[in-house]
């Protein structure tokens, strides 16, 4: 059979649609939302390519409209996790022997299906199941997931081209082989794209996976599997199971063929996973790969020269998009007293224009938090701030779960820099501001550095480039920094 050195198609980012009033995509998406709301979906597990139903039904309800029944999924147990492992290991020999070009073609096809005929269905499923507005859904479950599938192929191509130099008369070669066993993908609710990428990336590289999605993102996970199957993914390569985390962990982490975990979620859960793997290390055929991303206590730091309007925009957009349910969302801000009154005024103006409500109304910028547990955690934090002598709720603070899990975007002013909401992740639409003495920039930067164990994202605002360089150096271990220099 003729062979060749195959060149990939040109890989580019998926364009984002606007969903502006009167646009065809807006009309199509609204129609898809109405269609999904008119039915009660049956959502089975997918093991070895087959739909698995247990009859133990769990309701799927929109977080913003929890009286509406959107669908029901079939709850599994330990036996289904074992079935998924068995199916993955059965599929492994054929999958890992498949040419990389064929594996790449499957995921490129999946990206095209996602961005094409499945686009609005995926948006609608994510919007309804996870309470995302149209724009937040579009950039996540369509554009970012398509980018993951496509750029993973590009990255795989580049990895395979990483080959050693050879001495005269010798041809050295590196073979990038899959892991010995199966990969466990444990995925979050807040990004459909991450949920699809965590099993998708290892599968692309020839691995087989057991995938347990968040119980609040089962609906979109099932649709991802439907797309992958249509794209040609062989049965058993990725197996989708719905069960509790501890149930899955008991089976997965005690199995001799456990080869790796791909995780996004809370820091404490990841710590527990790591400890369990260490405890069981003698059981495994190989050393499991542990890949994970956890929480953040992401900050905004403005120096005395910063532009108040820009800082206010960063606060509102950085803290409240998707209800602050992003590990990269801003949740604490350090603002000097000389610009704080102006910043607060701009924030008040911006937040007065923010609408809170269901995703079906495209003018709602903020929707519901994911579930009752999240609602209770956030409302308790607001109540505690209202009662504390060390903090004050200065904007927002209202909440209501009568129809959906709605938390009004809220800003707390902390009078002490170590107030609890300056340190601990809440994962919701609450940002805490500490107003500091403009003469104590360095001291406040030191407080910022030592206040939280998290180091994910941060933003520094200044009109002085030298200040930005100095602050960036001092905070380089606190986050993946972004700096903002106002040139006007």
Where on the chain are the PLM-derived regions?
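ALDH superfamily catalytic-core signature
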Residues: 227-232, 254-256, 260, 267-417, ...
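Residue-level signal for inorganic ion chemistry
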Residues: 67, 88, 103, 206, ...
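Rossmann-like NAD(P) dinucleotide-binding subdomain of oxidoreductase/dehydrogenase enzymes
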Residues: 127, 145-146, 154-310
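Conserved C-terminal structural/oligomerization subdomain of aldehyde/semialdehyde dehydrogenase
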Residues: 1-7, 14, 18, 65-71, ...
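Glycine-rich loop-to-alpha-helix module at the N-terminal edge of alpha/beta enzyme cores
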Residues: 53-55, 59-61, 66-160, 450
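Short linear capping/connector segments at secondary-structure termini
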Residues: 125-132, 164-168, 361-367
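Hydrophobic face of amphipathic alpha-helices that form TPR/SEL1-like repeat modules
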Residues: 1-70
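Generic, well-ordered alpha-helical scaffold segments in large soluble proteins
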Residues: 84-94, 109-113, 117, 125, ...
């Amino acid at each position: 059979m003729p062979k060749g050195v195959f060149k990939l198609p040109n890989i580019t980012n998926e364009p984002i649609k606007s969903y502006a009033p009167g646009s065809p995509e807006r009309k199509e998406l609204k129609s898809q939302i109405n269609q999904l709301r008119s039915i009660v979906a049956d959502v089975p597990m997918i093991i070895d390519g087959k739909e698995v139903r247990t009859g133990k039904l769990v309701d799927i309800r929109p977080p913003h409209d929890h009286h509406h029944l959107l669908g029901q999924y079939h709850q599994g147990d330990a036996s289904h996790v074992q079935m998924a492992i068995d199916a993955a290991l059965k599929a492994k020999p054929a999958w890992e022997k498949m040419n990389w070009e064929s594996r790449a073609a499957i995921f490129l096809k999946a990206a095209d299906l996602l961005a094409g005929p499945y686009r609005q269905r995926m948006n609608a499923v994510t919007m309804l199941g996870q309470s995302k507005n149209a724009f937040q859904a579009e950039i996540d479950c369509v554009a970012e997931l398509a980018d993951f599938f496509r750029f993973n192929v590009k990255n795989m191509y580049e990895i395979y081209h990483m080959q050693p130099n050879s001495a005269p008369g010798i041809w050295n070669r590196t073979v990038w082989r899959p892991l010995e066993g199966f990969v466990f993908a444990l995925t979050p609710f807040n990004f459909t794209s991450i949920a699809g990428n965590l099993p998708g990336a290892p599968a692309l590289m020839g691995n087989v996976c057991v995938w347990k999605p968040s119980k609040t993102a089962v609906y979109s996970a099932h649709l991802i599997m439907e797309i992958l199957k249509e794209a040609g993914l062989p049965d058993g390569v990725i197996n989708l199971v719905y069960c509790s985390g501890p149930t899955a962990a008991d089976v997965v982490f005690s199995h001799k063929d456990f080869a790796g975990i791909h995780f996004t979620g809370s820091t404490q859960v990841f710590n527990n996973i790591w400890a369990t793997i260490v405890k069981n290390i003698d059981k495994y055929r190989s050393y499991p790969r542990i890949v994970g991303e956890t929480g953040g206590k992401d900050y905004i730091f403005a120096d005395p020269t910063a532009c108040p309007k820009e800082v206010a925009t960063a606060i509102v957009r950085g803290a409240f998009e998707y209800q602050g349910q992003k590990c990269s969302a801003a949740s604490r801000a350090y603002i000097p007293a000389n610009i704080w009154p102006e910043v607060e005024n701009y924030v008040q103006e911006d937040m007065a224009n923010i609408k809170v409500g269901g995703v079906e109304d495209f003018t709602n910028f903020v929707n519901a938090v994911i579930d009752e547990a999240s609602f209770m955690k956030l409302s308790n934090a607001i109540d505690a701030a209202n009662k504390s002598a060390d903090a004050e709720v200065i904007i927002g603070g209202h909440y209501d779960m009568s129809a959906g899990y709605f938390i009004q975007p809220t800003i707390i002013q902390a009078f002490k820099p170590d107030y609890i909401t300056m340190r601990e992740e809440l994962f919701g639409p609450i940002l805490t501001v500490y107003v500091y003495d403009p003469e104590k920039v360095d001291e406040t930067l030191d407080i910022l550095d030592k206040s939280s164990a998290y180091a994910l994202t941060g933003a520094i605002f200044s009109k002085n480039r030298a200040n930005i360089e100095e602050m960036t150096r001092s905070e380089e271990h606190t986050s993946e920094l972004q700096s903002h220099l106002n040139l006007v």
